[in-house]
Amino acid sequence: MLPDLAEALQQRRQEGLYRFRQVLEGPQSPRVTIDGRDFLAFCSNDYLGLANHPALIEAVAAGAQRYGVGSGASHLISGHSRAHHELEEALAEFVGLPRTLLFSTGYMANMAVVTALMGREDAIFADRLNHASLNDAALLSRARFIRYPHLDLVTLEKQLKTIQARRRLIVTDAVFSMDGDRAPVAELLALCQRFDAWLLLDDAHGFGVLGEQGKGSLYDPQEVERNVPHLIYMATLGKAAGVSGAFVAAQASMIETLIQHSRTYGYTTAAAPLLAHALLTSLQLISQGVWRRERLVQLIEQLRQKLQSLPWQLLLSDTPIQPLLVGGSREAVRLDQALRERGIWVPAIRPPTVPQGMARLRISLSAAHAGEDVDQLSAALHDLAGC
């Protein structure tokens, strides 16, 4: 069996699909150090530049002083601290939904929702470019799993009309992690109302970045209020929020159902309470950080203007995720390595993360970047393109 594994790994190398971990010597930042060498990084999902914010560092220390380091148990035993509880209440108020439930990761949150609600008699309708966690959750639930072409609501409507099921759940990224485009949330909620379905909205890359005060893809409070019975909102706390974790927000009966039936909630140790304590400060920074979101908009516009003349396709996106489509996996790796030789780190994204023939450089912007950083990246890419 071991020779089979070695052969499969070698095949992966030959196809340009082998992945390596990079060991950072310091905090997450637009400037990182790897093996003693400094890089200008466009890699992380630290969209607001909060991962190394002094106020969060102080909050973590204060949380450790008050709550210690570990939670020691699951939320359902003795691991649910005052910090966890206050964060859940603050998040519910922030996004405008009745209740929230904390999870250690977005993957666990998506798995919890789908497997707790759906079974063999049910149907899940999923955008073809959804995050892997949504796909894995759907498969594990044993529900019927129907995928529709990316953002194709005409096809989705036909599927909802023709496929009968006890329960129906539409699952979608709100901001698609590898393309940077957005799901039409209002239209999806309208379909849920028409066909008596739930919408699980994964806003991992929108929370903190989009909407008023960074409230994410739930930009219209009246729309949210009208659709509470149909809406299940998931967002992560390790991207724009700069810390770690995730939460699900929904009506009270939905949250209670997840507490009772979600295996990834009940059968795991709760995240360290010091993280929840720090996230209360993060939520304040997000709410008050209008200038950070404005800065991001400026950087996005600057980048798109400078990269339009490249021979590679810059996918349409108004979010911090700016994908540069190069096609083949080997070409993506070549460009990744050539940029690193110039002191710039932009990750090559290859199958199976993206479809075959759709390999890309995934440029991630942060409010911590400077305009000069974008200029440096642009100059390097134009040099590599021979422009």
UniProtKB/Swiss-Prot annotation:
One Gene Ontology MF term: 8-amino-7-oxononanoate synthase activity
Residues annotated with N6-(pyridoxal phosphate)lysine modification: 239
UniProt keyword annotation of rRNA processing present: no
EC number in record: 2.3.1.47
Pathways per UniProt: Cofactor biosynthesis; biotin biosynthesis
A Pfam family the protein falls into: Aminotran_1_2
Secretion signal span: none
Sequence positions that bind substrate: 19, 131, 353
Alphabetic keyword roster: Biotin biosynthesis, Pyridoxal phosphate, Transferase
Catalyses which reaction(s): 6-carboxyhexanoyl-[ACP] + L-alanine + H(+) = (8S)-8-amino-7-oxononanoate + holo-[ACP] + CO2
Positions contributing to pyridoxal 5'-phosphate binding: 106-107, 177, 205, 236
GO biological process: biotin biosynthetic process
Lineage: superkingdom: Bacteria
Cofactor(s), names only, from the UniProt record: pyridoxal 5'-phosphate
UniProt xrefs under InterPro entries: Aminotransferase_I/II_large (IPR004839), AON_synthase_class-II (IPR050087), AONS_Archaea/Proteobacteria (IPR004723), AONS_Proteobacteria (IPR022834), PyrdxlP-dep_Trfase (IPR015424), PyrdxlP-dep_Trfase_major (IPR015421), PyrdxlP-dep_Trfase_small (IPR015422)
Subunit organization: Homodimer.
Assigned protein family: Belongs to the class-II pyridoxal-phosphate-dependent aminotransferase family. BioF subfamily.
NCBIfam families associated with the record: bioF (TIGR00858)
Identification of the protein by name: 8-amino-7-oxononanoate synthase
Source species of the chain: Nitrosomonas eutropha (strain DSM 101675 / C91 / Nm57)
